[in-house]
Amino acid sequence: MQALYDVPAPAKLNLFLHVTGRRPDGYHLLQSVFMLIDWCDVLHFEVRGNGTVTREDLTSALPADDLVVRAARALQKATGCPQGVHIGVSKHIPAQAGLGGGSSDAASTLLALNRLWKLKLSRQQLHSIALTLGADVPFFLCGASAWVEGIGDIIRRLELEHQLPPAAFAVVKPEAGLDTRMIFSHPSLKRDSSCATISGFAATHYQFGSNDLQPVAQALCPEITQAINWLESKGLQGRMTGSGSAVFAQITHAVDLHDAPAAWHVKVCENLKSHPLADWVFG
């Protein structure tokens, strides 16, 4: 196998997000449920025998924080693989949205190259590499929606009685974006939420908890409030995902979403029972 085309990288929604503390090193401790949705970036991979890693959609110098290239190089370094790859990314998931697009791209890169380069790493081995790339990347390797704790490193798949029921969601990304660092460094951020339980979440699912980052994000980005108010005008209860600026609401009745501001991204999404690449890795 010398190439893989049309490899999906799904977005996520945080059904709730509680900040429960802060470690001495400054990292915040979180609790959240990460839910996979069918809004996907699409990646393409072609093996190169010279060991180089390139991106066809970036004609200028690669940014130092490009997660897709970092993921490929981290996998090379961890395994000593001499092969390279040429990567294309068709971006559909908006950036600075709290939807995890960049992290999902990195995870799909690890899964695809593990297969293309015939490395046969387990899910846990890929998880160790993913931890070096960013807090959300390990989740996208776990194969399904999950309960996530710590700094994103404690991940439990939602299965059996805790599995999420099928549902549709209106996802709205305002024109403005947000830098995650601005929110977590803000003095007004709530950092002492009580710890939740999976059983407590399972009792209400899509109505559980809140997003502790949302008040700060709304103060920094008024468009978030505008988007939530727009959803409420449709009879939908909106909340922010991740660190924003995207918001979402479960769709429980017929609703017309065609009058949103032209600069907003509005998409109706369904949750995914499993990651589309869940069976590409064992363990």
From Swiss-Prot:
Active site: K12, D136
Residues the record lists as binding ATP: P94, A95, Q96, A97, G98, L99, G100, G101, G102, S103, S104
GO molecular function: 4-(cytidine 5'-diphospho)-2-C-methyl-D-erythritol kinase activity; ATP binding
InterPro entries: GHMP_kinase_C_dom, GHMP_kinase_C_sf, GHMP_kinase_N_dom, IspE, Ribosomal_Su5_D2-typ_SF, Ribsml_uS5_D2-typ_fold_subgr
Residue ranges crossing the lipid bilayer per the database entry: none
Catalytic reactions on record: 4-CDP-2-C-methyl-D-erythritol + ATP = 4-CDP-2-C-methyl-D-erythritol 2-phosphate + ADP + H(+)
NCBIfam families (UniProt xref): ispE
Family designation: Belongs to the GHMP kinase family. IspE subfamily.
Function of the protein: Catalyzes the phosphorylation of the position 2 hydroxy group of 4-diphosphocytidyl-2C-methyl-D-erythritol.
Protein's name in the database: 4-diphosphocytidyl-2-C-methyl-D-erythritol kinase
Source lineage: Bacteria, Pseudomonadati, Pseudomonadota, Betaproteobacteria, Burkholderiales
